């Protein structure tokens, strides 16, 4: 089982010491995973979308932890929450956000390596990520749900992901 105990990831009830791979790059080979393992890394923070399904199998096999990230990145739309600003705060986009978050969850939920889910990457916070958080928490009872750009707002579980943080 995976949980969150006072901001620290817990695996089967025991705190997990985490060290995140600093730069994932665009592709990951089995030899890269083994090299990262030798260097003491055990956590991969995936980018938004476009990750090969074999990566999850490799991480399962080699004992890496993974934070799965939904394929949402609205960084090109700016960070404005005003009307006409970022789509994250536009209710017209809510169904699309929920669909992407849910698809990301259902695609990866059975991989033991997936220890947390991230709502989006580089997007303004707003109603669609609030609703996405609530929706995902309704589906996932144990693993943390994160949004690194939440800025201390309630739609991200508090979790330290690396000793360097």
Language-model segments: which ranges?
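Substrate-binding/catalytic cleft of secreted carbohydrate-active enzymes
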Residues: 29-31, 43-165
């Amino acid at each position: 089982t995976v949980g969150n105990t006072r901001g620290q990831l817990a695996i089967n009830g025991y705190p997990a010491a985490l060290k995140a791979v600093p730069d994932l790059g665009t592709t990951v080979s089995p030899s890269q995973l083994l090299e990262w393992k030798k260097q003491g890394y055990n956590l991969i923070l995936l980018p938004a979308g476009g990750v090969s399904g074999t990566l999850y199998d490799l991480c399962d096999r080699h004992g890496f932890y993974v934070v799965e990230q939904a394929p949402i990145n609205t960084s090109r739309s700016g960070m404005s929450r005003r009307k006409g600003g970022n789509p994250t705060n536009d209710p017209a986009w809510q169904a699309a956000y929920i669909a992407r978050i849910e698809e990301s969850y259902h695609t990866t939920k059975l991989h033991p390596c997936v220890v947390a889910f991230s709502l989006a990457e580089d997007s303004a916070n707003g109603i669609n990520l609030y609703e996405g958080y609530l929706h995902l928490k309704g589906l996932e009872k144990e693993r943390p749900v994160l949004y690194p750009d939440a800025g201390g707002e309630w739609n991200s579980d508090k979790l330290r992901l690396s000793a360097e943080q």
